[in-house]
């Protein structure tokens, strides 16, 4: 949490992954991926998403704003190990068994499709694709409406720190594929 003191008033800006909801994280992700916003405007939108008043943001001097961006980006990640399973609404969702997470080809195909479609809640979709219920068939699991419903379920029930290890794995896998020319 960043405490920002301006004009004799203190404002709190959440910048830790365990303080930010997955729904907010989806918005932040979409803002930071925007091709139409400049970098400063992106951070203005991010800070507004996290509750900092627009008037305060736009009234800051540039040096203070840049320092705020640097402080915000100093987020600490508490765990790099992805969760194996989670229970939501009475259902157990499992990402992997065994000691280590490995991508399934179908998961990567669906993640790639979601990215190309430009879904606005891409981090939630990553979780929706990776976490599966044992009582569903493969076809049921990958059904678009099921994935949308499950993405919303994750948005409503987890913080960003739950999703970040998986997003990191997807990013690393994508970079490796690009480096390998795949």
PLM ranges: what are they?
Residues 1-182:
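Charged interaction scaffolds used for protein-protein
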């Amino acid at each position: 949490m960043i405490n920002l003191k301006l004009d004799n008033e203190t404002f709190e800006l959440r910048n830790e992954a365990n303080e930010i909801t997955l729904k907010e994280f989806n918005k932040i992700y979409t803002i930071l991926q925007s091709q139409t916003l400049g970098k400063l405007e992106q951070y203005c939108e991010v800070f507004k998403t996290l509750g900092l008043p627009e008037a305060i943001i736009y009234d800051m001097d540039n040096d203070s704003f840049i320092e705020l961006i640097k402080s915000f980006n100093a987020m600490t990640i508490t765990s790099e190990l992805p969760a194996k399973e989670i229970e939501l609404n009475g259902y157990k969702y499992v990402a992997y068994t065994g000691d280590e997470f490995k991508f399934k080809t179908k998961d990567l195909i669906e993640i790639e499709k979601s990215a190309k479609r430009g879904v606005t809640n891409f981090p939630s979709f990553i979780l929706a694709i990776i976490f599966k219920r044992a009582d569903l068939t493969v076809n049921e699991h990958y059904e678009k409406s099921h994935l949308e419903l499950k993405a919303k379920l994750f948005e409503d029930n987890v913080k960003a720190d739950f999703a970040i290890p998986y997003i990191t794995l997807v990013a690393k896998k994508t970079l490796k594929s690009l480096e390998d020319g795949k």
